[in-house]
Structures are given as structure tokens and as C-alpha cells.
Regions:
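Sec-dependent N-terminal signal peptides
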Residues: 4-13
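Subset of outer-membrane beta-barrel
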Residues: 19-312
Length: 312
């Protein structure tokens, strides 16, 4: 028998302040999603999609999908990058969507590249009140019908990348703290708190030239709550394909396993995240990652090696 978990009702009532952002395991592959300054950072068209099915076995548990693409604008100059993303997040009776465009400017600095990015977005929040059986049907905290609304949002980011060796960045999303008013009567609302991200990563070359150790870390906080994520992947760089396997750890929250491969610019990955708070091993999070990267630098000589700072 399925366990019941009305996350949307138990955690957030309409009129409360909600933490909007979903947590993905493969943060290393979604760098421009978390920080707009990473858009068009290398000479690639980067397309990635991730689907996360969290807390398997619980009804109403989060199901999140994100699609993100970015590229440099070579006809203007490699200093400019653009991107777009779409997020669809379902949590119990709530549905959250976000459509965003992003622009980044890159400048050579101290042997690396300093980047600054901005991302305007449209937030769309819905609440399926008709699907909820309330003990007190007249509770003003909840809508009893299906309601939805939208609001303008804005994200900004700053990042420094040193060759393909290491990077560090900070970003602020929901910078304006938008409030989404739901329904025609606007009686209910959801306020999205600003959230801040700090990211960093380092690629360590091993003795064998075909192996590398990629380490990434991210800390996110909306001032009230915080979450840290650390992952390490062992990469095998073959002549025609790449393989990786690794581990992730989020203090006080979860541990997980990462697996994947890259073949001619196509990356497919899988991760399983187990919660350490007593949820149960079989009630973890499955995440599927599918990506594609292709060299766009028409002035570069030689073969397309499909190398990307996101995958190394």
C-alpha cells in the first residue's frame, strides 16, 4: 500500500513563503542552470535534460524535470553566451514551472575567464485544490478549486574559470523575491524567497593520462534553510568514449551513486540518492540525465574532440 505524502499541504500552505528550487543530484552537469554566468562558457552547444523522481513510494512526492541549453555567440564574439531553460516541478498538489532566458559576458582575467550573467524568467505556480480532501473545507489557507498564477523573476551570477582546471562561482536566484498571486480573485499567494548558491570544482589529473578525478561542491541557502552537495567522479577518457562513476554526499540529507558515459558528444547518466533521515533505502531518488554537446567554433582547426568544461 502506498504511503501518503501530501508534501504540498504539509510543508507549504497558500500564503506562506516557499523555497521554489528543486535539488538535483548531478549538479556538475547543470552549471548554467544554477548560475547564468556559465552560459556559453566554452565553444560548445550544450543541451542537457534531467528528470528526478524523488522519495519513490510516497504519493505526492516531488517529480522534477529540467531542460537547459546554452551556447556562445561566435558571430558577435566568444565573449558573449546565451541560454534558455524550462523547469517543471510537481510536489503534491502544487505545480511549479519556470521559463528563463540567460545572457553571460566573459572576459579574460588572470589567466582564466571572469563571467557575469543575468537571467530574466517567468514563474508559474499552480495548486490543484479540487484534488484535496480537507477535513475543514472552509479553511481559508487552502483554495478548494484549481488556481494558478505567474510572476516575473530575475537571477544573476558571477563565475571565475581557470582553464579546465578549476572554477568558482556565486549566484542569486529569485533576486526580487516574487510573489505569485493565485486565482482570479488573487486571494491566495506564494512568495518565493531569494536563494543564494556558491559553487566550486576542481579537476585532478591522475598518473594514468586517461583518468581524471572531477570534484564539485555546491552550497545553497535561502537564509532560513541550507543544503550542501559534494560529488566526486572518476573519469575515463577513451579515444571514442568516456565513462564515469562516482559518489555524492549531502550532509545530514543523503548519499548517492553516480554513473554515466559520453559517446560522440552524447552523455547519458543515472544516479540514485538514498536519504539518511530514516526514509528508507528503497524510497530514494532516481535521476536520469541526458545531454549533448557539439563544437560550434567554426574557426578551430582539427577534429571535434567534444571536450567540455562541464564534463571534465
Amino acid at each position: 500500500m502506498k504511503k501518503l505524502l501530501w508534501i504540498g499541504m504539509l510543508i507549504v500552505s497558500l500564503g506562506a513563503r516557499a523555497q521554489f528550487d528543486a535539488a538535483f543530484t548531478n549538479t556538475w552537469a547543470l552549471q548554467s542552470y544554477y548560475n547564468p554566468a556559465a552560459a556559453g562558457l566554452d565553444s560548445k552547444l550544450n543541451v542537457v535534460g534531467a528528470y528526478s523522481l524523488q522519495m519513490v513510494g510516497y504519493e505526492g512526492a516531488p517529480k522534477t524535470m529540467v531542460f537547459n541549453a546554452d551556447m556562445p555567440l561566435f558571430f558577435i564574439g566568444p565573449k558573449h553566451g546565451v541560454g534558455a531553460a524550462f523547469l517543471n516541478d510537481a510536489i503534491g498538489a502544487f505545480s511549479n514551472k519556470k521559463i528563463q532566458l540567460q545572457y553571460a559576458f566573459h572576459k579574460k582575467f588572470l589567466g582564466g575567464r571572469m563571467s557575469i550573467g543575468v537571467r530574466p524568467a517567468l514563474l508559474m505556480v499552480g495548486f490543484n485544490g479540487s484534488e484535496i480532501d480537507l477535513r475543514e473545507p472552509n479553511d481559508p489557507a487552502f483554495a478548494t478549486s484549481d488556481v494558478k498564477g505567474n510572476a516575473f523573476d530575475l537571477d544573476v551570477g558571477l563565475r571565475y574559470t581557470y582553464k579546465q582546471l578549476w572554477y568558482a562561482g556565486v549566484s542569486a536566484v529569485h533576486l526580487l523575491g516574487p510573489t505569485v498571486k493565485l486565482g482570479d480573485d488573487k486571494l491566495h499567494e506564494v512568495t518565493v524567497e531569494p536563494t543564494f548558491y556558491v559553487q566550486g570544482g576542481y579537476n585532478l589529473a591522475l598518473r594514468h593520462p586517461r583518468y581524471k578525478l572531477a570534484m564539485d561542491a555546491m552550497l545553497r541557502s535561502d537564509i532560513t534553510n541550507w543544503r550542501g552537495d559534494i560529488n566526486a567522479r572518476l573519469l575515463y577518457d577513451g579515444e571514442k568514449h568516456k565513462l564515469y562513476g562516482g559518489l555524492m554526499y549531502s550532509p545530514t540529507i543523503s548519499v548517492g551513486l553516480l554513473l554515466g558515459f559520453d559517446f560522440h558528444g552524447i552523455n547519458i547518466g543515472y544516479s540514485y540518492e538514498v536519504y539518511t533521515g530514516g526514509v528508507g533505502v528503497i524510497n530514494g531518488t532516481h535521476e536520469i540525465l541526458i545531454g549533448y554537446h557539439h563544437d560550434l567554433d567554426v574557426f578551430k582547426k582539427g577534429k571535434n574532440l567534444h571536450k567540455s568544461v562541464r564534463l571534465l
